[in-house]
Amino acid sequence: MTRWEIARERSHRHFASAPFVASAAASGGAGAAVRDGDGDKTYEAIIVVAGGMTDDGGLPAWVTSRLDFVKEEYDRHVAAKREAPYVVLAGSATPHKPPPLAKGGFLLHESTAMATYLADRGVPRAKMLKDTASMDTIGNAYFTLTSHAIPRGWRDVLIVTSKFHMGRTRAAFEWVWNLYVPSSDGAGAAAGDAAPSAPHVRLSFHATPDDGLDASVIEARAAREAKSEAALRKNATEVTTLAAFAEWQFTTHMCYAVLRQDEIGEFEEMKTDPALKSY
């Protein structure tokens, strides 16, 4: 098989998310919040990865845990009289179940629901940015990079998600964001340029507790997460430029490829999977 055929086959098998498995990004007891980095560090942006919604458009406890930490981190910057970071809310919907609808029958994006939650708790709307294109973790990484980080020239970014989701999140963001090669004039380098030896953007990660999930759900999700993380890290060794990544994502991935768009809306695989309760 060619390199692209191998990547395509992997994408067909491993496009979804799964529970947290211990990695350099997060460790410790079940449900513990784990931080990688300096608690006094200043960030230009905090990205919170979406984690699903209830059928009526509410946010589950493991998602509000992420957002409550983001509010604390935002307030820490303000209290220290540092420049307030942007808060990026990453996620549209999940491919694993139908999305709830908003006013007027429009899709209620997960990022919109998260923005409302933070706005109600005092985070200024002018400091929040949305990604309404991504449907999974690798999409979160790609669209936050290309829509927000590159145009704004960010160099220090904090990524927030739940403990069960951190392994795959770290694999996705480190793969995609480390492909970005800026040119000397501040614009993006040629799309096919190889990734630099040192990342242009410094990424930190924070894992929040798996609130609201029982052990059986976390165990089921963890099995899915482990497979997805392994597939991401394997693909990262074969897809090594941003141009190659875009080709891979938009021609092989179920959530983004026209070739596979008819697969969206088929939920049979997930109906009996306990992990569905974590989406």
Predicted features and spans:
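A structured, mid-to-C-terminal "fold-capping" secondary-structure block
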Residues: 206-279
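A structural signal for short, hydrophobic/glycine-enriched beta-strand patches
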Residues: 2-228, 279
